[in-house]
Amino acid sequence: MVEAKNGSLCGAGAPDPGRAEPPHAADHTRQITQRQVRGAGGMKSVGQDSLGVQRTLSVDGKEYGYFSLAAAAEKLGDIARLPVSLKVLLENILRYEDGSSTTVKDAEAIVAWLETASSTQEVPFRPARILMQDFTGVPGVVDLAAMRDGIVRLGGEPDRVNPLVPVDLVIDHSVMVDVSGTKDSLERNVEIEFERNGERYTFLRWGQSAFDNFRVVPPGTGICHQVNLEYLGQCVWTADTGGKTWAYPDTLFGTDSHTTMVNGVGILGWGVGGIEAEAAMLGQPIAMLIPDVIGFRLTGTLPEGATATDLVLTVTQMLRKRGVVGKFVEFFGPALDNLPVADRATIGNMAPEYGATCGFFPVDRVAMEFLRLTGRDEHRIKLVEAYAKAQGLWRETSTPDPVFTDMLELDLSTVVPSLAGPKRPQDRVALSDAAAAFKTELTKSLGVPANDVGTRAAVAGRNFEIGHGDVVIAAITSCTNTSNPNVLVAAGLVARKARAKGLTAKPWVKTSLAPGSQVVTEYLNASGLSADLDALGFQTVGYGCTTCIGNSGPLDEEIADAIEDNKLVAVSVLSGNRNFEGRISPNVRANYLASPPLVVAYALLGTMTQDITTEPLGTGSDGKPVYLRDVWPTNAEIAEVISKCLSREQFLKRYGEVFKGPKQWQALQVETGTGTYRWNDGSTYVKNPPYFDGITMEPKPIGDITGARILAVLADNITTDHISPAGSIKKSSPAGAYLLERQVSAADFNSYGARRGNHEIMMRGTFANIRIKNEMVPGVEGGMTRLVPGNAQMPIYDAAMHYQQQGIPLVVFAGKEYGMGSSRDWAAKGTMLLGVRAVVVESFERIHRSNLVGMGVLPLTFKDGATRQSLGITGDEVIDILGIADLRAGMDLSLVIHRADGKTDTVPVKCRVDTADEVNYYKHGGILHYVLRGMAKAA
């Protein structure tokens, strides 16, 4: 029985969302240390409920308190047609309303959004929890440890620095495809992973024991977003406080941009920079502009042969064209009645690629089926449904359409098999056009002279040649697709049919399978498809991000040499979500996103230059050509395998050991009982960053930037990969030189991502992407610049250190969509540590702009159509930025350009410090300084 009734909260207390375990995780409580459980929760002495909206919900005889949106509507006005995502924000405000940091006016601003379907108001938001991965998590824990040192300097106690909301860190970013195509690939890659990362992992285990509310999902378990979707996420969370159990929406910030994957099951969350996440976990409300909400109406059903991957690439192309940066996208329409959560999660996952803050699907019957399949507790499922219905968050076919800022519509029956590439995820191309489009790109954007397109090169010691367009990496990878049984089973069936016909992968293709969850192995084994994938070289290489984030591992040396010696444009085909240039492999210049079954098909074909829809994949054992149509499974074949081989029990089994980890994890020894971390000066992985050196209780006054030199002039679409690469470290780079000086061999360099706990390496890696092009040094790729005056060409890091020694501040100029891609806080941290005081561009991607402010770097945008080109910026100028002393959110500042010929121009620029809170962060030198001083004063 489910019923809602009025109720009230006795006393002045308010909900305190403690560390609520996922409902099917009771058996793991013993694995969580007492320290992690003690002091859990984030809402302290707030929630005064000025509007009187507390109510009680009864589910199977158990009562839950909640903050009723229906009751709020009686005081604030009708909210029935608010987008569901904004209703979640409204509930958050009601629950935290304390009359100061969060007020009734904030709630009124959400309701007022309905008047124009837009707003210029900012409101505070506090997520229920934080999700981290290890590349961002290690520097996050480093920062927390450094803050403990900092608060001691200010006279406080180290235990004042603790996460106040639950934090889950999933180790998924470090495994690399060192070994592939063998039966023991998984075991050998795990061994190598621990050899490389034992120091980092020991540090994380220290953090797990030292900090409250901090859990670690060990390596070899899965990808954070898939673990979040299948296990950590609850849709509705509960907490026991003040003698009552409270229910509230599951919301989160993630330190990875693809946190939005969990939007597919009705959980509102998005990626933020590690800096912002650290502030949120330390109890700070995060101010956000009430977003525009774009409604995306879905109708029809996917046709035979089209996959969820094809759907999301189509959605990404449409939304990029429309322009949704900084906006919520909310999906609705009749197609949702039969659109599985796996497909929804694929669409939600790629919100960063289409530019939105999130890609949200409301809770409905389909979501409940997913919760049941994945092993959530039956009472929790009933609670989710009852709560969603009581709050108007539940979607039915008959639910009236919400009010949206703007709308798009897609008939799923029009979706066709597709790829996206060769450099951007929004560059979708129909599969039938892919070969022709690639040949055009070869000469257009990839720089191959027309008379060299047919070049073939011998591979030493092998009996084959390779040429432009040959596929050298075929990777089934990424939570985007490995969370989706439909496309993984399809890949297995393609492998089965190809194997039966005697086809094999081309010998120059490095093949791999890296599921985002161990459940994938369960159903592939149960169906017998693992054997078919293994036969084509798609053995499981690890449970982690691997190729999707650039951890593709080395190609065979002879193949890599043939590519580099002959300047070949080699290709990767991967079931990932990003394909930026230089991301996947240093030997690969063209990267195509594809569904898992197409990844298998391209491994068979071996090239992008042939039309895979009309030309044979190869010759079968009977001597006849085998075409894509011969091996492609029907929807009915896929559905039959899933119905027989995917079960709730598989999720319960695998997630029953989610905190266990491999034997190497269990063997790690850590020092416990220390309030501050004992830094090892000789460590090349974990170092105490200088952020809080010399910190005082009061910040110094801010002022104008004068006499600045230009460190780099960059083009459009500069990604956080360009600014702070995650991939391999070159011996010849400043970071490589640093490691060699410390007796680290090149074989043990690991990646920039794995070294993010060491600021010395990350500073040297800033702007060090092998494909970045600084317009100050035309024709040169890599992190180079000119030292001005004098024009000496040198690595960006070396130039920055020269300027720092002279006390000269630095500025970076760039074009549109600066900072697109991953929510990589080191792209801002490294920028700051190089001495860059301001970044002047045409437009920013959302997360990176926020991160720059969080590190005390001024983000500025040109006005009135001005660009670096129209202003003639060459890098020889001296720059002043005036008006900073009177900084206000969104104000104009003056950019003064002193040219080499003695002329001076002054132009207005918009200060993208967007909120009053951000102004405070900037005045303090960054968000962590602001939080630390607040903690010290409160002690």
What do these predicted regions represent?
Residues 1-2, 10-15, 19-21:
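Intrinsic, low-complexity polybasic segments
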Residues 16, 27-28:
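Intrinsic-disorder-associated, low-complexity terminal segments enriched in Asp/Asn/His/Tyr and depleted
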Residues 22, 35:
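Cationic, low-complexity basic patches in intrinsically disordered or flexible, solvent-exposed regions
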Residues 29-33:
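Intrinsic disorder/low-complexity segments
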Residues 42-939:
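Fe-S-dependent hydro-lyases/dehydratases of central metabolism
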